[in-house]
Structures are given as structure tokens and as C-alpha cells.
Amino acid sequence: MPEEKKSTPYEQLRKYKFYAGKQEAKKISASQCGAPLLQLYLSQTCLAVDGPNKFSKATIGSIAHRGMEELIEGEHLEKEIAMERMLSNGWKITGTSDLIDHENKVVIDYKFEMNYAYRMHFKEGPDSPYNMQGACYSWLCHDKDPLGIVTNLDYEFHLMSFITDHSPIKKDHPAEAIQVTQMPIYDNLLFESKMLAKTNELEHAINSKTPPVECDDVWWRSVNGIKVRTRCEYYCKYKDVCPYVTKHSSAKANVASWG
């Protein structure tokens, strides 16, 4: 029999990145805590497919995360710590921190993104996905660790952002391609009250089968003379099932040309 052909590195990555499915009912992850209500509704009611034909930005980020796990070492560091906590209305909030630095009392999350998304996220205010993700980790750490031991950790939350299209000669780019940002942390009771209100509203929408209103900020941008919902077209995996976005709503832009 002929020797079986070994898969190429690219083929292995294609297998690693495939995802298709619907999120577990009544569960929200830390990275979703600041997401628009419509996006959460679609995640609970529709299938999201990261299909076999192309790599998504999330795929590249996942692969890079695996590399960071192997690169950073230290006895005072914990990697990929999964936590979860229940709200009083039965919704589960989960979070997996990329890195916890016990020596410096910091929870670190890696972000791999283009400069445009990096800048836009920091313009979104106190309820931005990044701020709410940090608030979620703080809230989770104040409950229990993975072994069930109450910790009440008062740790800072830092974002380590890797600007994938960084250019030192462009004025709107940061000085370096890797940026570490200390994020403000919500009061834990305030975070919990916000998430209770959000999940109650979400559950009502699900039960009534009524999609929430369109997302407030879809990052409108004119690209090659065409007005594009940037956030929908390039950063939302539910765009093909969103009632406010059609597959032909805007032409695809040449992302490589963006600054």
C-alpha cells in the first residue's frame, strides 16, 4: 500500500480553526458581557459558522493565543484559568483568563487586532466590551477559584494588544506594535446589576422571539466611496443571520489598504 500522505501545516491549521454551532443556552462569556443585546440574541438563537473556506480573524487570534501559552513561563503565572458564576436569574457567566500574574496581581488578556479596531474599542466608553470583560474577570475572581475556594482577589485587568497591521510611520498608530493598557474596573455590585438587567432583557427577547433593536454603533466607514458597516462586515460572525444586515448590503472592501 502506498504511504499515507501527511497533512501540511496549512491543512492542520484548517482543521484546527473550523467551528460551527450554537452557544450553550443561558450562558454568556466574559468577552460577550459588553456585546450589543442583538449580538447576544443571535448567539443564543442562531448558528454561527466559521466555515472551511477561509480563516477568520478569531482563528488567527486563537492560533496566536496558543503560541503565547508556550512562550510565557514563570512559577507565579497561571494560564487559561476557567471560571464561572451564576446570576440569581439562572444565567451563567463564564470567563477564561489568558494569564494571571500573581506576583504583580494582574489578570492579562491578549488581543490580536488591526489598528482600526484597537482605536475604535477605546472610544466606546465605560460599557465597552473591553471594560466589561475586565469587570467580569474581577467579579468572577471575587467568587471562587477553579477549586471552589473563595479568593476575593483584587487584581488589576490589563489588555496586551498586538496590532497586526502596525506601521510606525502612520500618525494614528501607536508607537509600538504591542500595547499594554490597564483597564478601569467596575464596582462588582454594579457589574452584577448590569448583567442581571441585560440577561433579563435578553431572555424576554428570546422567549418572545423578538430580535432586539439594531446595534447602536456599527462603525460606519467610507471605503473606496462605499459606505460600509465595518463592525458588521468584518467583526461579527452573525452578520449572515442578522435581520438588519443582508449579504449584499455593502461591497467588500480591501482590508489590506486600511490605515
What name fits each language-model region?
Residues 1-107, 114-122, 128, 142, ...:
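Metal-dependent nuclease catalytic cores that hydrolyze phosphodiester bonds in DNA/RNA
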Residues 109-112, 157:
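Residue-level recognition of conserved beta-strand positions in structured domain cores
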Residues 66-73, 123-161:
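Metal-dependent nuclease catalytic cores in nucleic-acid-processing enzymes
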Residues 4-5, 143-259:
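Metal-dependent nuclease catalytic regions and adjoining charged, substrate-binding loops involved
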Residues 54-62, 127, 131, 185-196:
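Generic detection of long, well-ordered alpha-helical segments
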Residues 63-70, 136, 193-197, 201:
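Long, highly charged amphipathic alpha-helices
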